[in-house]
A protein has these predicted regions:
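The conserved acidic donor/metal-binding loop of glycosyltransferases
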Residues: 124-128
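A short, N-terminal amphipathic alpha-helix
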Residues: 37-52
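Left-handed beta-helix
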Residues: 1, 262-322
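Short phosphate-binding loop-to-helix
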Residues: 71-118, 129-130
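N-terminal nucleotide-binding beta1-loop-alpha1 segment
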Residues: 1-25
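Acidic donor-binding segment of Leloir-type glycosyltransferases
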Residues: 48-80
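Short aromatic-hydrophobic micro-motifs that form the base-stacking/packing surface
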Residues: 119-123
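Conserved core of the sugar-phosphate nucleotidyltransferase
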Residues: 130-274, 284-288
Length: 322
């Protein structure tokens, strides 16, 4: 019985705006308005509809989040218990300290629960297009008998449904390219934090997450080189990932496939396992909404324009009777 009730998990919903968090239009991304409700409440609505979610631990600017939750007619109906925590200095501390609270609560229910066995689902506050079925698909795909950290990914083919078209604006996101295809991480993380050896790397990767500039790329490469667990192979796959991304931008000539072919996804997962000193894997989801975070004012505008249509499109993908 991991993480609380049978086959369900506590969720850490990250809504902080300190450290390297980037506001959009000067506002915490989770507190932006979307169809008359804060963005983070759309995320909470999808979480509460998933049978795999036991409870929600919301961490961020406590007073503003509390005020937002007291507004009428929210998409979140309060069917799952919510614990609201004040934020700390950065993303890592928000997650780690919230996990300590989760552990305290779970052990009060189950004193025999070992800290290293507690599994949590970590989700950001700015993915309002995530549908409950994508949460279900991700959690069901996580083999937590074999792995301790699983990240969700979506294929470029899946994400192409959200690309710009003649009749509407869209969002085109950068993908990483491996032998099996092109993918993007989709913001869903299933993890046993106590079995993640290099937990502090989460903050380092987050700090350099917008790796479109060579400065950010090289800074993270230096961090990888300095890691005790890093090898030349680890640095090589990192550079090859970026080489493939750069070559992917050359139109009509698929040169990116050359470095991508040298990177089987399993090899990448093994390297990440070494770097984090854990058992790491990925799970592909087929909806795509969780990958579309609100990262810029343009993304915010596009999601507002297409919200109903893109939610409806994902609903139409759900098999009848599910």
């Amino acid at each position: 019985m991991e993480g609380g009730s049978s086959k369900s998990y506590p969720v850490i919903l990250a809504a902080g705006d300190r450290g390297r968090a980037r506001p959009v239009l000067g506002v915490n991304k989770g507190l932006l308005d979307l169809q008359g409700a804060p963005v983070f409440t759309h995320v909470m609505a999808s979480l509460e509809q998933s049978p795999w979610v036991d409870s929600i631990y919301l961490v961020g600017p406590q007073e503003r989040l509390m005020e937002a939750l007291e507004r009428p007619n929210l998409p979140f109906k309060g069917t799952k218990p919510v614990t609201l925590l004040a934020q700390w200095e950065n993303l890592y501390l928000n997650i780690w300290n919230t996990f300590q609270k989760v552990m305290e609560d779970q052990r009060s229910k189950n004193p025999a629960l070992l800290p290293e066995d507690l599994t949590v689902l970590i989700v950001p506050c700015d993915i309002p297009l995530m549908v409950p079925e994508e949460v279900d698909e991700f959690v069901q795909g996580c083999d937590m008998e074999r792995f301790d950290y699983v990240v969700g990914i979506s294929s470029e083919q899946t994400l192409s449904r959200y690309y710009p078209q003649k009749h509407r604006r869209g969002i085109r996101l950068m993908c990483f390219h491996v032998r099996e295809g092109s993918f993007r991480q989709n913001n869903l993380h299933m993890v046993r934090p106590m079995r993640l050896g290099n937990r502090d790397y989460i903050q380092k990767i987050y700090d350099h997450r917008l790796q479109r500039e060579w400065g950010s790329i090289l800074r993270l490469l230096w961090e990888i080189f300095m890691a005790e667990e890093a090898t030349l192979s680890t640095a090589t796959w990192y550079l090859m990932l970026h080489m493939a991304a750069i070559l992917h931008g050359i139109p009509k000539v698929p040169l990116y496939r050359l470095p991508a072919y040298c990177l089987p996804k399993a090899r990448l997962e093994r390297s990440v396992s070494r770097l984090f000193r854990t058992r790491f894997s990925t799970v592909e989801t087929s909806f795509g909404g969780a990958a579309l975070d609100i990262d810029t004012p343009e993304h915010y505008g596009v999601i507002k324009e297409n919200f109903e249509a893109w939610i409806r499109m994902q609903r139409e993908m759900i098999p009848s009777g599910r």
